[in-house]
């Protein structure tokens, strides 16, 4: 047993308990795979991360990302939250103004703009439209008609998201999915707000007014699907799809989490060929654990 530094971070929010919580073990070296998996099950958060010395000389640190059931090669809110914890604990990047994280998909670049961190969206491992049988299955799960889905796309960038676009943000917010009816889908849903009519609340200024509403559903530990409060990996792949297809401008804000009482905000910006996914963080817990 060893005493290790620990933080719990709320990601994609400026206000505590309105984003997506992340557990970060800052001193993960020496823990076995089984110990990491067991601790992630114990936290029961959507993800728990363990920071380690990098094996890639270009990286500043290495991260391993666990859900309560599996290890992930990449995930978005753990990327931003882990970087926030690493920097706040005294981490010094090799290059001023940017951080390089090593994870299961390789290197992920991050940058800081004021208090906000953003990561460079990794390339999608699979894109293109979904097959029709999958689209119909997703429609049944969401409780909508097939015709309500106006577009669809593979958004696999580690997590194998299968994304559908509805005609409006209001339709996304109105969804009442049958969470127990599926067990192996990873479903992302997006819909646009009318211009200038983003969902207000929780101190939104004009700069934070969302252009899109997003919801995400993933396999739950006890069976069926669960809803994720705010999802960086899905928003990254959605941005690549929506901007590339002309459905979104090169800079926008997405809202996520309203159905769970959250108010996540994901800041998207395309620069050249890179899409940056940004968010604020709040550290709610700092301390030590014995593991």
Model-derived features with residue positions:
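Active-site proximal loop and beta-alpha junction motif in alpha/beta enzyme cores
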Residues: 1-74, 80-291
């Amino acid at each position: 047993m060893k005493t290790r530094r620990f933080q719990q971070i709320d990601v994609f929010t400026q206000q505590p308990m309105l984003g997506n919580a992340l557990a970060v073990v800052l001193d993960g070296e020496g823990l076995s795979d089984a110990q990491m998996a067991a601790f992630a099950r114990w936290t029961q958060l959507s993800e728990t991360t363990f920071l380690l010395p990098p094996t890639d000389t270009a990286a500043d640190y290495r991260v391993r990302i666990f859900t309560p059931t599996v290890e992930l090669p990449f995930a978005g809110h753990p990327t931003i939250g882990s970087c926030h914890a690493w920097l706040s604990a005294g981490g010094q990047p090799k290059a001023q103004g940017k951080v390089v994280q090593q994870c299961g998909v390789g290197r992920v670049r991050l940058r800081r703009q004021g208090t906000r961190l953003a990561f460079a969206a990794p390339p999608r491992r699979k894109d293109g439209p979904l097959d029709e049988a999958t689209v119909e299955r997703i429609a049944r799960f969401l409780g909508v008609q097939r015709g309500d889905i106006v577009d669809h796309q593979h958004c696999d960038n580690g997590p194998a998201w299968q994304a559908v676009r509805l005609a409006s943000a209001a339709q996304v917010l109105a969804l009442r999915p049958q969470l127990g009816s599926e067990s192996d889908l990873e479903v992302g849903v997006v819909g646009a707000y009318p211009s200038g009519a983003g969902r207000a609340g929780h101190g939104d200024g004009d700069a934070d007014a969302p252009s899109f509403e997003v919801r995400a559903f993933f396999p739950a530990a006890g069976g069926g699907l669960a809803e994720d409060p705010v999802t960086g990996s899905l928003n990254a792949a959605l941005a690549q799809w929506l901007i590339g297809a002309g459905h979104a401008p090169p800079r926008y804000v997405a809202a996520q989490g309203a159905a769970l009482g959250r108010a996540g905000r994901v800041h998207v910006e395309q620069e050249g060929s890179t899409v940056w996914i940004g968010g604020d963080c709040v550290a709610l817990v700092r301390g030590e654990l014995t593991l």
